[in-house]
Amino acid sequence: SINFGFGKYVNRNVVDGYGGASRGVEQWTVRASRALASDPDRIDVGPLRYEVLEPLHAVRVVLEPNAVQPLAYDLVLRGSLPCALEEREDRRTLTGYRRSADQIRYHQLGVASGWVQLEGRRIEVTPESWLMTRDHSWGLRPAVGVPCTDLQPDPMDVHPPRVLAAWSPVLFTPPPGAGGSPWALMLYYLLYAGEGWRHEKSQGGFEHADGRREPVERIEPQLRFDPRNKRLVGGSFVLTMPDGGMRRFTLRVLGDTGFHLGAGLYHGFDGHYHGQWRGPLHVDGEHFADCSSPDSVARLNQFRDCLVELRDEASGALGIGNCQTWVQGHWPALGLPEG
């Protein structure tokens, strides 16, 4: 799997980004950061380039050959479905005043084309065999910059809550010759719970090529995780529809491939964070031989893109997509009796 991401932090005069690849438990990452003022009308940074080909429909992402890792690619990401706007996220500390996130995001599912070169081997990427998921968010994002040290202590730092989060866009494509249009299922579930309080949020639904959307009322994740590294290993999502009907989708993890987003600075990596000033231009990266080991996960954190297959138990339809997860605390039902 191939990953690409970038951020533009106007108030910090920073543009940063990353390009990476996951193959089984191996992972390669190239990161770059520069001063926004050096070229304010572009978000290209170091060997990373991003180009809008057709607004809200097709973009091009490029990682040029570089001296950091034996990885390069040039990919066009084309939507099979329209972009879909998610609900605003407004997360705050328990006082209700300080926001940890206040952001809007849209996502899109489709196919990819182009090429990838890894360790000297060139791989052709065709829309018949590669899919893409992408998202674009803006607003106040969590974990930007080095954590502040002069803030009121947050009770959740002393008594960490139980957390279960799953963000999963999945594309369903009719078999060849079957006719019909592609459709998607997008699920976003977020649960924070502590002594005397609980915050639970479900959003998402079914998305169609003509722009129609069928929302879900409630999501019940019945997932399983590996206690060694908190990797998703399987499970299902039970959906409650607005009319009270229920639908179950069985989840199957498609191997070990899945990019750990910590290497892209999500939640920080080796003391560095999104939007952090690294100088006029800074480029670095690394290779992990085994991202599944507890030592690697301790460095990278558990947050990762996981390639999954969803099966609609009612119709038998199969979809393939991404499932990002974060789980924290005591969850015996999820395979995490020790937290």
Segments (PLM) and residue ranges:
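Structured soluble/peripheral alpha/beta segments that form catalytic or ligand/cofactor-binding pockets
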Residues: 1-339
